[in-house]
C-alpha cells in the first residue's frame, strides 16, 4: 500500500521507464527540424555550449568527443532525452532537436528554458528540482500531455492556460498563488500545485480530475471540491482546513490525505467507504467513531492528534499499516484484533501494557519508544519483526526478545525507571535486575554516591541522608541481525521520615512526613478577632511555609500559626444619622461628643435602639464583629401652669406629651374662651393636638364679657322668685361694677366655690373668685336702698 503514498513519484518513474535506463536515439522517418537547424556539420560543443549537456549529447549521438561534428540529420534522430542529475545549467542547443517528444532535465540547475519554445512535438517534459521561474517558452507547446515542474521558482502559470491537452500537471513546491490559468484545462486527470494558493474556485470545471494534490498551500475552503466527483486520490496536507463537509460526496476516493490541518470533526468521512489509504496525522482529532465503518482501509495514519480511545478501530481488520504515535493512549487493547498489521507506530504515548500486540504475528515493524513499557514478554512470539524500536521505556529484562531472529534494525537505548522507595539507612542494598538477551545480569556502568557492586547486589554507605541513589547500565546487545546499545538509568528513592510540629497558641500537633515530600496543610486554625496569616518557622517573624512548593527537609521542623488582629467598625446611630470608628479587636472606642436632642436628656450609647446594654467607653472592648451603638435619650418633663386671673394650678408633662385639659373655669358675667399662651391674645392651646414643648409654659384662661341688658322702666317687671324663695330684684347696670345680671343667691355660692377651686380633682369645683363679689354686695345694698325709697314715696303719696 506504500505505492499510494508516492503517487506523483510513480508518474515520474513511469515516464522515466519510457526512456529506459540509458538514452535512445530514434529515427524520425525524415521529419525535418521545425524550430532551428544547422546548415553544416558542427562540433557538438559548439551546438550545446553547456559542458555537461555536451558530454551527454556526445553519448546520445554516438560520438567519441564533444568536438566531433554532427549534422542536422544526426540531431533529428533524437526524440527522447534523459538528462537528469548532470549539473546542467543551460539547455542552449536543444532548439535544434526538432523531433524531441520527451525530455527529462530534473535535478539540474536550469533557469532559462527558452530553447524549448518551438519544440512543438514535445508531449512530456520533466524539469522538476531546478531554478526555473519563467515558463513563457512553454506557451505554444500545445501537444504537451504531461508536464512536471515541481520544486522550482515559478510564480506565474498563465503561459499554461492554452495547453488544453495536458492530462498531467505537477507544479508543487513553487511560489504560485493564482491558479486561474488552470480553469480551462479540462483534460487534466492529475494535478498538483503551489504553496501559496488560497482560492480553489478555478478547479470547478476540472471534473475529469482523478488525482489532485494541493499540499502545502493556504487553503481553508474546499467547498469547490464537491464538484470533482471523479476524484480517486486527494492529497491536501499542510493547509488550513477545518471543515471537510464538502468531501462527503466524493465516494470514489480511495486515497485521502489531510495531514497537517486543523481538523477536529471528521464525521463526514463515515460516507467514504471506498477509502483504502487515509492520512489524518497532525490535526486535533479526538473522536474516531466516524472511522468505524471504513472497513476497506489498509493504511491509516493518526499520529500527532489528541486521541485517547481507539475502540472504533477494532473492526478495521483489513489494516496493514497503522500509525498512532504522539497521542494520549494508555489502553491499546482494541488493536489486538487487527491481525493483518505489518506496520505499527505507538511512540510518544503513555502506554505501560504492550501485551495487546501479542496476537499481531504478521508485524514486521513495531515502534513504541518513549512510553512506560517495562514488560516485553508479549513480544516473544512476534517472530516476523525485522524492525523494533523500544528505546526510552522502562525495560530491564531482554530475555523475551531472544527468538526475534529476523530483526535487522533495533533500538533499546535510554531506558529509565524508578524502583519503589525503601527506607533510608546508613547501609542500603538493592538487587540488580537488568538482564541481557541471555538472561545474564548486566553489571552497572556507574553507581552514584560511591556505591559498590557485588553480584547480584548494589550497596551504598550513606552516613548522612540523601533522597535517592542510582546506577546506570550500558551494554551492546545483538538480537537477530540487529545490534544496539541497551542502556539506561535505575533510580532508588530513599524515604526519610521526620516530624513536622504545628503550634497554635501553645497547642501542638505532630505529623510524620517523608523528606522531600510536600506537607499536607492542616485545617486553618481559628482565633476570635484575628485572621490566620499562615504557618511560619518562628513564633513571630520568620518565613512563611508554602505548602505548594516547600518540601520537608531532612530534619524535624516547627511551624507556628501566626495571626493578624482584625479591625471592626463601630457605627454610632443618632436617630438615623450615623458616624463610624474603626477599631482593632479588643480596642477601646473613643467616645463621641454627647449628642443633643430637643426635649430629651442623652442617656448614653447602647447596643440596641431600645433597652440593651450601655457601652462603657472606659472598659467595654471591641468585640470580634462590627457593632452599632445607638444614642438613647430620656424625655424631659416640663411644667404647664394654668393661670385663671392670677390663680394658678400646674401639670407636669413629658416633652411632646399631651396636657390634660382642666375643667372649664367660670367667671360671673363672662364666657370662657379657652386657654392661651398669653394673658391677652396669643395662641389658643389645643389639648387634642398641641404637644408639650421643651420648656415650662403658662396657659392663661381668657374670657369674653357677656353683654348687659338695659333696665326696664315703670316698675312693670315683677321680681323673680328663685327656688329658695328669694326674690331676685330686677337687673341694673351699676357703674364701676364688673358684673351684670348676677343674682344675690348665686353670688355667695360663687365666692364659696372659688375659694375651694381645684380644676382637676373636684367635679363640683367652680372657677376661682375673680374679685367681683364685693361689687355685687354693694349693688345689692344700693338696690335695697332704692327699693325702700320708692316704697316710702308711694306710701307718702297715698297718705295725702
From Swiss-Prot:
InterPro entries: Cu-Rt/internalin_Ig-like, Ig_E-set, Inl_IR, InlA, InlB-like_B-rpt, Internalin_N, Leu-rich_rpt, Leu-rich_rpt_4. B- repeats lie at residues 518-587, 588-657, 658-706. It comes from the Bacteria. A motif (LPXTG sorting signal) lies at residues 767-771. Belongs to the internalin family. PANTHER family: LEUCINE-RICH REPEAT AND IQ DOMAIN-CONTAINING PROTEIN 1-RELATED (PTHR46652), LEUCINE-RICH REPEAT-CONTAINING PROTEIN 9 (PTHR46652:SF3). This is Internalin A. It comes from Listeria monocytogenes serotype 4b (strain F2365).
